[in-house]
Amino acid sequence: MGSRPCSPSACLAPWWGQQPGGPGPAKRSRLEEPAGPESRAAPSPEDPAGTPAVDALTSMVVLDAGCALRVPLEDVDLVLELAPMSVLRVSLGGHTLIVIPEVLLSSVDECSGAQGDWSAGLEVDVFLGAHGEDVVVEQEVCASVPEIAAEEEAYEEDADSEFPELWMDSAAGSAAGLYPSARSMFSPYREGPIRGPCALAPNPSSERRSPRPIFDLEFHLLEPVPSSPLQPLPPSPSPGPHARPELPERPPCKVRRRLFQE
């Protein structure tokens, strides 16, 4: 009955005080001290950000036709196969692997005249530590100069066979009463006739062209057929002033009378 309640100052230590198993005040003050050069240790090997940057290594491999390159990784084996005219670039971690077919190098050597030993071997054991998610494959398609020239010649031959040349005979055209123009071909545009040469220029690739059974170079555009009953029409006379009747003059409209008062 006569006991007094305990004052707040007589309570136990607050909840943020020292707890069993926790650090004491002395240890807490030690942690708040600035870290010295000894405490600034290098990051662990598991942290890739702390490791110093290593210069990327680039290697080149030349593959023969019908061969493939096998690169052993941690879990799987990476097999690289190339198209005849393509360059493959593979990034394995800090290493870059460039795979080039031998056909492409041989065509480049023939065009430039350079001679070099590009078939040096490559030790792929350096890629054993590369991770599977670090593998990046890029493929580039290349074409040699002889193939491009052959494609251009084939395209020109196709264009020549699709659009045959049509030449006109000036003597036959003038005798039939047509336009005696042996150096012009009429175009559908408004500029007028297109002037062109009347003689065929020698083409070095004419021997390789296929024969043209439908069109012939001796075909005359405006020459009439003798056995045909169709003959060219005479020129039409120009209409005189009496051919078109004159319209009666109408009085000007209301708007014209308001704008232009006489």
Curated annotation (Swiss-Prot):
Positions with biased composition (Pro residues): 226-242
Cystine crosslinks: none
Comp. bias intervals (Basic residues): 253-262
Biased composition (Basic and acidic residues): 243-252
InterPro entries listed in its UniProt record: PRR23 (IPR018903)
Region of interest called Disordered, as start-end residue ranges on this chain: 1-52, 225-262
Coiled-coil residues: none
Similarity annotation: Belongs to the PRR23 family.
PANTHER family with a match to the protein in the record: PROLINE-RICH PROTEIN 23B, PROLINE-RICH PROTEIN 23C
Record-given protein name: Proline-rich protein 23C
Native organism: Homo sapiens
